[in-house]
Amino acid sequence: MASLGVNIDHIANVRQARRTVEPDPVPMALMAELGGADGITIHLREDRRHIQDRDLTLLGQTVRTRLNLEMAATTEMVEIALREQPDMVTLVPERREEVTTEGGLDVRSQCKSLSSVIDTLQSNDIPVSLFVDPDRNQLEACQQSGARWVELHTGRYAEASWREQPITLARLIEATEQARSMGLRVNAGHGLTYQNVEPIAAIAGMEELNIGHTIVARALCVGLQEAVREMKCLVQNPRRDPLFGSTSS
């Protein structure tokens, strides 16, 4: 049964749109936990477009589940992670011109530098996950890098047409099996919604789904606790066959 990590970046986006103090993502993280979140995910970007350093510090002091810090593999971010000691770091690619993370890390071409970052963090008791596309070559590079986890990028699945979705889903199923056979633990995320999450949650060996935008959007209608509760129900009780996405009897 997969667990649910709630990404609260989009709450900070609303705050930063007016450069003000509200909504504050710190108490909102508590509301997400009260709704059933198994963890809180934030992305501290180099340009600080949404989550700020004070958010990370305060969340580290207040989150009662676990705090997953998404970040680029830069010297500055490594220093921040070592200081703040999140429960996990997920290394992600980052480009200033992108609206959101657009693809997985190219671990193959950066394996040496990433290995150094991973070793530094894990030797300080911070487990590291790598955000990657569901590609065997990338998974092999993840294994070589020393990372213990991968987070599979579900963007292509989320954006696929109904004809293409079974193909992209099959790739994620295969990648999960491959990663686990290499000794890697598997999370997934990006673009998942209330409408498409169940087949991903039903994949054998999937440990956690990190979901943000759709939960925050739903919260505008029903409140954050209820929005998280609804998603948690789908993640923990998926009703769809993970190969074909059809409703089971």
Swiss-Prot record:
Residues at the site labelled Transition state stabilizer: 151
Protein's recorded name: Pyridoxine 5'-phosphate synthase
E.C. no: 2.6.99.2
Database matches in SUPFAM superfamilies: Pyridoxine 5'-phosphate synthase
Complex formation: Homooctamer; tetramer of dimers.
Origin organism lineage: Bacteria, Bacillati, Cyanobacteriota, Cyanophyceae, Synechococcales
Cysteine disulfide links: none
Keyword Zinc-finger attributed: no
GO cellular component, one term: cytosol
Localization terms from the record: Cytoplasm
GO terms of biological process kind: pyridoxine biosynthetic process
Position of the signal peptide: none
Native source species: Synechococcus sp. (strain CC9311)
EC class: transferase
Pathway note: Cofactor biosynthesis; pyridoxine 5'-phosphate biosynthesis; pyridoxine 5'-phosphate from D-erythrose 4-phosphate: step 5/5
Similarity remark: Belongs to the PNP synthase family.
